[in-house]
Amino acid sequence: MLDREGYRPNVGIILVNTRNEVFWGKRIREHSWQFPQGGIKHGESPEQAMFRELFEEVGLRPEHVKILGRTRGWLRYDVPKHWIKREWRNTYRGQKQIWFLLRLVGRDSDVCLRASTHPEFDAWRWSDYWVPLEAVIEFKRQVYQQALFELSKTLFRTRPCDPPEAYKALAEVREP
């Protein structure tokens, strides 16, 4: 399901533990790491899609997490042409995402990367809140910057968490 501009509706999940470290998943049979994410099915709300993806990719149920916040609007990224299947190149541009910030209220042992018949990750770890900016694949970096910065205002209520010096200029949220 694509919108008129060629973007697939999607949800992204930033899952934090009690130390405000983020869940970081290693894509199966690859050397890349990312946050859980996935498409919104027809008739599904972003929140319903988020809970479905959370279970499919991480094995967590609604009782294992608390929703702390979500982005105000859609954040978009374009997928490089050479990554797009030939038959989709004239219609598909990338993803548009609503991002959710979740707190793990369960235990680390509740995480199960094999909850689905098609696992996305084969390893995971907790990382510093800003580490994903250094490690995510380049074409997703701006969306990660926008989501992390916007949701840091919710997570670190006393004042927004400062990104590392190298990312301060990059972390400004740009309105679409």
Swiss-Prot record:
Top-level taxon: Bacteria
Cofactor annotation: a divalent metal cation
An example Gene Ontology CC term for this record: cytoplasm
Keyword Hydrolase: yes
PROSITE patterns, alphabetized: NUDIX, NUDIX_BOX
Enzyme class: hydrolase
GO biological process terms, semicolon-separated: mRNA catabolic process
Record-level Gene Ontology MF annotations: mRNA 5'-diphosphatase activity
Domain Nudix hydrolase residues, every copy: 6-149
CDD domains, A to Z: NUDIX_Ap4A_hydrolase_plant_like
Role: Accelerates the degradation of transcripts by removing pyrophosphate from the 5'-end of triphosphorylated RNA, leading to a more labile monophosphorylated state that can stimulate subsequent ribonuclease cleavage.
Official protein name in the record: RNA pyrophosphohydrolase
Record organism: Aromatoleum aromaticum (strain DSM 19018 / LMG 30748 / EbN1)
